[in-house]
């Protein structure tokens, strides 16, 4: 059995428990982060950790089938952090937040994070930039606009 890091980002990381089985282990396993239990009964070979801090070293541990595995990793550094709610977003699930959320995304520099706190945000098309993270806090939901005329048509794409 082996524990591997698939991807480390600024505020999350994805791991795989390589156990010779597809998708699920034979028995659920315990996942710890810096010695504290995160999942008591993880039942997927690939799992994620969230709400991490940028540029921080962590140790993830797995206790599976009598074996203990651990792996130290560092989250990516973050160059900029912006709370998108400071752009005037309304988290009621009905107000169109497309322009305001797009402004937050467009002004975020490379390596930065646009943070969306818990709430329901209605929006149409958003255009992301490379090397920018849109981080949705637990309870944050993006709702797509139901009106197709609010979405651009991109000719030739």
Residues of each region from the PLM?
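Extracellular/periplasmic carbohydrate-active domains that bind, remodel
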Residues: 1-157
């Amino acid at each position: 059995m082996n524990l591997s890091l698939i991807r480390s980002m600024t505020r999350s990381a994805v791991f795989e428990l390589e156990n010779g089985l597809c998708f699920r282990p034979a028995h659920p396993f315990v996942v710890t982060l810096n010695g504290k239990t995160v999942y008591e009964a993880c039942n997927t070979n690939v799992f994620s950790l969230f709400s991490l801090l940028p540029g921080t070293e962590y140790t993830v541990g797995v206790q599976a089938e009598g074996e203990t595995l651990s792996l130290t990793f560092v989250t990516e550094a973050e160059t900029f952090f912006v709370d998108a709610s400071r752009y005037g977003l309304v988290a009621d699930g009905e107000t169109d937040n497309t322009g305001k959320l797009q402004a937050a995304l467009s002004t975020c520099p490379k390596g930065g994070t646009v943070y969306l706190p818990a709430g329901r945000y209605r929006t149409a098309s958003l255009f992301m930039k490379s090397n920018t993270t849109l981080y949705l806090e637990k309870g944050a939901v993006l709702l797509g606009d139901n009106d197709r005329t609010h979405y651009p048509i991109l000719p030739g794409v």
